[in-house]
């Protein structure tokens, strides 16, 4: 219905994790679509043999965002992560190749900037929690990176979506 009310030569932006799903935009002809896929595509390694998994970047972002803005603990987010991954495999990744353009939102300094925020959140996971092994693994992983103070990050940085202090209001 929104599409039918659009003015001639206007732009309709559909944003979100399901925006590339063809069922969502079936009423719009493909020739009128320009699809952009934005994702963390980590391209750095710890050494010649150990690449940083994209999922670690994404999980750390989510742990921080869920804690700061949704009131979830790291334990809660880690416990939900397998379900999130199954949902991605079913509803997001199959459609990423439909994109006309891909944007890699990973930044070389990201893990150093996230470390200061992530460590105390991950440290709240108790040893007796089943999620402790994953929290401990992430804490050890973060030790590879020096801290970068977030005060130097501009308000328009994508990392502000997770760390807070951004220029945009959601």
Listing of model-derived features with the role each one plays in the protein:
Residues 13-14, 103:
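N-terminal Rossmann-like NAD(P) cofactor-binding module of classical short-chain dehydrogenase/reductase
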Residues 17-20:
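Short beta->alpha connector loops
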Residues 8-12, 34:
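Loop/turn-to-beta-strand initiation segments
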Residues 22-170:
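Conserved NTP phosphate-binding and transfer environment spanning the P-loop NTPase/kinase superfamily
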Residues 2-3:
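Short, small-residue-biased leader/transition segments that mark boundaries at the very start
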């Amino acid at each position: 219905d929104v599409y039918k009310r659009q003015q001639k030569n206007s732009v309709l932006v559909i944003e979100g994790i399901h925006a590339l799903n063809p069922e969502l935009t079936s009423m719009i002809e493909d020739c009128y679509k320009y699809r952009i896929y934005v994702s963390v595509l980590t391209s750095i390694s710890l050494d010649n043999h150990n690449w940083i998994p994209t999922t670690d970047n994404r999980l750390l972002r989510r742990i921080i965002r869920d804690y700061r803005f949704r009131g979830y603990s790291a334990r809660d987010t880690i416990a939900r992560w397998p379900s999130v991954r199954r949902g991605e495999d079913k509803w997001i990744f199959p459609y990423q190749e439909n994109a006309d353009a891909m944007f890699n939102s990973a930044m070389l300094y990201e893990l150093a900037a996230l470390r200061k925020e992530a460590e105390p959140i991950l440290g709240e996971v108790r040893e007796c929690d089943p999620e402790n092994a994953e929290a401990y693994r992430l804490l050890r992983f973060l030790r590879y990176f020096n801290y970068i103070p977030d005060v130097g990050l501009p308000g328009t940085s994508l990392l502000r979506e997770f760390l807070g202090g951004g220029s945009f209001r959601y």
